[in-house]
Swiss-Prot record:
Cellular component GO terms, alphabetical: cytosol
Molecular functions per Gene Ontology: ATP binding; hydroxymethylpyrimidine kinase activity; phosphomethylpyrimidine kinase activity
Keywords assigned by UniProt, alphabetized: ATP-binding, Kinase, Nucleotide-binding, Thiamine biosynthesis, Transferase
Matches recorded under Pfam families: Phos_pyr_kin
Biological source species: Mycobacterium tuberculosis (strain ATCC 25618 / H37Rv)
Misc. comment: Was identified as a high-confidence drug target.
Official protein name in the record: Hydroxymethylpyrimidine/phosphomethylpyrimidine kinase
Matching InterPro entries: HMP/HMP-P_kinase_dom, PM/HMP-P_kinase-1, Ribokinase-like
The UniProt record lists the keyword Transferase: yes
Length: 275
């Protein structure tokens, strides 16, 4: 595949801000985001929303970052360094969702924003308070350039169980009605299919992205990696459909390069680009 260009030595690369939680096991969250950004030629900036105590077996505890610290990190980055795109991951609670949305509006940010509505870990551990769903729908989604829910998240957000292409389109349309410019309903969790079909919708047209389903249990951080790769491509100037196409191909290669770690699920790995 064609990679995003790396800036020549001494030249400032595009910057992307990840607003997300920290994963002590290093498989997902801001740790996964920063790995992907570095290998896609962008400078990674972060605003940590929560510190998780987790490993490959699951999430043991979550410690939320205070509102003023979340807002302060975002403001410190964008008012000095500047960013060409941003993405959100784990936001943990309604107060953090509200803080991120209010800060985005107050700073009048207009760069592409990829919202990955993280609700639970791959083990099923909750990463978002149920009360925060309304905050996501009402405050953050209208700011999003692209919303990237998986099938479980789509069900929680719009109460549509995706079981086939028709229900996937219905979920995309219902999610788009909540305000994002584009919606990508990821089909990787649809186990009845031999492949992985993601559906991109802009309110008018649907775009389908198919990929081979890879037989690996080491897929921790796949959703984070996809959203971050899309944000990196947007920072490089890609259109949304082209950024999604790139992100899909990137995460497929990361799945091929995934490695075992600990006693649970290992992470997807962008380190193949170094070989």
């Amino acid at each position: 595949m064609n990679y995003l260009p790396l800036a020549p030595p001494g030249m400032t690369p595009p910057r992307v801000l990840s607003i997300a939680g920290s994963d002590s096991g290093g498989g997902a969250g801001i740790q996964a985001d920063m790995r992907t950004m570095a290998l896609l030629g962008v400078h990674a900036c972060v605003a940590v929303t929560a510190v998780t105590v987790q490993n490959t077996l699951g999430v043991k505890d979550i410690h939320e970052v205070p509102n003023d610290v979340v807002a302060g990190q975002i403001e410190a980055v964008v008012t000095d360094i500047g960013v060409q795109a941003a993405k959100t991951g784990m936001l943990a609670s309604s107060r953090i969702v509200a803080t991120v949305a209010a800060t985005w509006r107050r700073l009048e940010l207009s760069v592409p924003l990829v919202v990955d509505p993280v609700c639970a870990s791959m083990h099923g551990d909750p990463l978002l308070a149920p009360s925060a769903l309304d905050s996501l729908r009402g405050q953050l989604f209208p700011l999003a350039t692209l919303l990237t829910p998986n099938l479980d998240e789509a069900r929680l957000l719009v109460d549509i169980e995706v079981v086939d292409a028709e229900s996937q389109r219905a979920a995309a349309k219902a999610l788009h009605a909540l305000g994002p410019q584009w919606v990508l309903v990821k089909g990787g969790h649809l186990r009845s299919s031999d492949g992985s079909c993601d559906l991109l919708y802009d309110g008018v047209s649907c775009y389908q992205f198919d990929a081979q389903r890879l037989p690996t249990g080491d897929d921790h951080g796949g959703g984070d990696t996809l959203a971050t790769a899309i944000a990196a491509a947007l920072a490089h100037g890609f259109t949304v459909p082209d950024a999604v196409d790139f992100g899909k191909r990137w995460v497929t290669e990361c799945l091929r390069a995934a490695y075992p770690l600990g006693r649970g699920h290992g992470p997807v790995s962008p380190l193949f680009r170094l070989s």
